[in-house]
């Protein structure tokens, strides 16, 4: 056994017989055992763990004299030294060594890539030292939350809010002063809006509120003594207090963050050995003049930003706010967003923003970054989790290298096609001015990056990937699972029914039926989700099962002989914002999905009042219309829907009223679709009127209390 020097004499190659004579020196046997596990799997050896250094040793050492996070790997004179400032980072350093020199890659928590090595190779007199610029790194992914060892391998946290009080992590005002307990007796504790106290936010200049919050924070810390961070933060709405005292401070500070920071500073002063976290989010995002005190953690959120371009280019107001906060404090936690919360499984081409955004945060001294991904399965879930974790650890890594490395190892020969898909869809959105929204819908991209022609191209790439690997191999199964995002986008394209490539129905011999290609796609989507335990469509709890059931119902509707199809619609009330405010949406044959962007006509604070002209007298037996509910976005079912008929569009007769079957409450299903239908018996009419009664305002218990509520309607069916 001997050391083999390369011809250039710049590298040292240690063969397996030589390596087997090494021992491992470490105060931590578990870290040494971990190294042995991967030595055994990569080169087939396990080394003696000892406290005696030999001529050839691997030394795992903790160096506590340096008061900062670091890892280092050194090779000199046949000694391999792996060191870090604490045990956690020593694990990270060991994993770094395993990855760099044993060519191991942890790609998901159920797949590790190995190579069959004959030796390990070092640059001569190798010395590597690295200080991670981000000290707390979190990717919101169940891959890490359910497997703490896998999280350690990728050097991220295994929980979303490390060190936080478990029940007080974000949007906590309502936890400190519950509406049910305080509002009736003390409405002055809450936000004044248009002369009315609403339980949407707290009045931050009320001294009793400050005392109650301090007492609550103290109780939480007593209950959870091992936690050292608690969130004292606004609830998830923009209805902050505008009383004279609060408004005066906000005006002086130049931002509603003024009252927030004054309030949170006052809380933090009472807990000098704890960290009080608060949000710079929506209305509090703009920094005030007052500085947060030392133990206040600012969680700065980028929720408004366009996800198709880097924040520094496409969201300059956020970039400016980030720089403003970084001048006030070094204690910044970034809360960034990397998925479409309304459609987890949809293609979401934010690939070109991941690295630039992390670099922006790091350049502005963010030491804590939380990348809020989907947690649950979403488009190319494993790939995204991997790339974000890698870049949080080392923002200087090359995105394309990471992309290709992962895909080639995780998908085998199919990997190059997955990389081509990622680059292709990113190029498509780069060539448009498309605003990629966190709460958007695939249908918004049907005239750009998700056009029928582009969908066909993506489909071809995934099919090439499938064809390039062995049928039913693990590679094949992974590619098939990853294809569901294209399957989902294609299904939504069929639903929209706007392209010859993806037609919803076909007609033969005057008989309308569903396109058989659609049926095959729907069945494949359902099977892939079922086989891989993919259960959620969005953050509102809308399940894959809900989606399949509603889609099949929509297909039954699509083949009905609808007398209203493509008939003229006159609106007697004014819609707002969605579906281009086009009344034809109600009769266009395209069926609304689970998102309000998906072919729904919206009315904010007012009723739907629509008249359909059938062109001539028609025999009518039944009428129905669908309505959408998304409670967290103040979208509710109508209180009731009334159907009318007329021969002349002047004199109207009511067919009856249909009440909402699912009364709104805090326990209502967040995302749902309800059909309001009525039997007409047998009558003849030319004109049909539908009036859907809006609740007008969100109820007092809702986070949007007193704001105008929405109703969303689609597809009047007249049989």
Predicted regions and their residues:
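Short, well-ordered secondary-structure micro-motifs within conserved domains or adaptor modules
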Residues: 39, 45-71, 82
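Substrate-binding cleft/loops of secretory-pathway carbohydrate-active enzymes
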Residues: 277-304, 345-352, 378-385
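Structured mid-domain segments that build the active-site/substrate or prosthetic-cofactor binding neighborhood
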Residues: 208-209, 219, 317-416, 420
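Bacterial Sec-dependent signal peptides at the C-terminal "C-region" and cleavage site
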Residues: 2-15
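Aromatic, loop-rich ligand-recognition surfaces of beta-strand-rich domains
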Residues: 592-656, 672-719
């Amino acid at each position: 056994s001997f050391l083999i020097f390369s011809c250039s004499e710049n590298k040292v190659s240690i063969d397996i017989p030589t390596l087997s004579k090494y021992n491992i020196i470490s105060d931590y046997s578990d870290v040494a055992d971990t190294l042995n596990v991967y030595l055994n799997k990569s080169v087939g050896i396990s080394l003696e763990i000892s406290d005696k250094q030999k001529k050839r040793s691997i030394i795992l050492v903790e160096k506590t004299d340096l008061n900062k996070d670091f890892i280092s790997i050194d090779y000199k004179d046949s000694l391999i030294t792996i060191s870090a400032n604490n045990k956690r980072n020593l694990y990270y350093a060991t994993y770094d060594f395993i990855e760099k020199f044993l060519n191991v890659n942890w790609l998901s928590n159920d797949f590790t890539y190995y190579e069959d090595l004959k030796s390990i190779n070092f640059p001569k007199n190798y010395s590597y030292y690295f200080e991670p610029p981000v000290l707390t790194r979190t990717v919101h992914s169940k891959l890490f939350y359910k497997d703490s060892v896998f999280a350690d391998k990728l050097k991220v946290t295994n929980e979303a809010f490390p060190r936080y009080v478990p029940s007080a992590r974000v949007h906590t005002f309502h936890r400190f002063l519950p509406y049910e307990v305080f509002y009736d007796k003390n409405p002055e504790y809450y936000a004044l809006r248009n002369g009315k106290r609403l339980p949407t936010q707290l009045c931050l200049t009320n001294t009793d509120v400050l005392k109650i919050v301090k007492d609550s924070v103290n109780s939480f810390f007593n209950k959870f003594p091992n936690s050292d961070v608690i969130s004292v933060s606004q609830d998830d709405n923009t209805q902050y207090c505008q009383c004279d005292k609060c408004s005066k401070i906000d005006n002086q500070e130049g931002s509603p963050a003024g009252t927030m920071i004054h309030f949170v500073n006052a809380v933090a002063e009472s807990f000098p050995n704890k960290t009080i976290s608060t949000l710079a989010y929506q209305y509090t995002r703009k920094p005030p003049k007052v500085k947060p005190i030392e133990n206040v953690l600012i969680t700065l959120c980028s929720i408004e930003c366009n996800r198709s371009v880097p924040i520094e280019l496409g969201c300059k107001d956020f970039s400016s706010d980030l720089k403003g906060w970084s001048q006030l404090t070094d204690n910044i936690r970034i809360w960034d967003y990397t998925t479409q919360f309304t459609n987890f499984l949809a293609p979401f081409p934010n690939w070109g923003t991941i690295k630039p955004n992390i670099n922006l945060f790091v350049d502005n001294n963010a030491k804590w970054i939380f990348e809020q991904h989907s947690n649950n399965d979403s488009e190319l879930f494993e790939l995204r989790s991997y790339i974000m974790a890698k870049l949080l650890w080392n923002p200087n890594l090359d995105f394309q290298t990471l992309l290709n490395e992962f895909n080639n190892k995780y998908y085998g020969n199919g990997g190059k096609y997955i990389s081509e898909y990622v680059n292709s869809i990113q190029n498509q959105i780069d060539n448009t001015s498309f605003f990629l929204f966190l709460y958007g819908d695939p249908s918004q991209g049907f005239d750009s990056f998700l056009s029928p022609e582009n969908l066909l191209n993506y489909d071809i790439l995934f099919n090439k990937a499938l064809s390039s690997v062995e049928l039913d191999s693990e590679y094949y199964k992974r590619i098939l699972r990853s294809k569901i995002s294209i399957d989902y986008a294609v299904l939504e394209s069929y639903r929209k029914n706007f392209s010859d490539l993806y037609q919803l129905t076909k007609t033969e011999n005057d008989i309308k039926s569903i396109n058989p290609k659609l049926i095959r796609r729907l069945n494949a989507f359902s099977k892939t989700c079922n086989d891989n335990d993919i259960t959620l469509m969005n953050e509102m709890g809308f399940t894959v099962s809900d989606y399949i059931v509603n889609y099949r119902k929509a297909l039954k509707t699509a083949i009905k002989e609808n007398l209203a199809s493509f008939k003229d619609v006159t609106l007697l009330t004014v819609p707002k914002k969605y579906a281009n405010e086009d009344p034809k949406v109600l009769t266009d044959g395209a069926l609304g999905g689970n998102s309000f962007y998906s072919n729904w006509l919206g009315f904010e604070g007012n009723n739907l009042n629509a008249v359909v002209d059938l062109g001539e007298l028609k025999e009518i037996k039944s009428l129905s219309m669908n309505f959408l509910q998304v409670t967290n976005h103040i979208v509710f079912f109508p209180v009731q829907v009334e159907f009318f008929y007329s021969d002349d569009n002047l004199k109207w007769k009511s067919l009856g009223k249909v009440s909402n079957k699912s009364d709104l409450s805090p326990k209502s299903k967040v995302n749902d679709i309800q059909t309001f239908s009525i039997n007409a018996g047998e009558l003849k009419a030319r004109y049909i009127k539908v009036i859907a009664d809006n609740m007008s305002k969100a109820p007092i218990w809702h986070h949007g209390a007193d704001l105008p509520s929405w109703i969303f309607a689609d597809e009047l069916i007249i049989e």
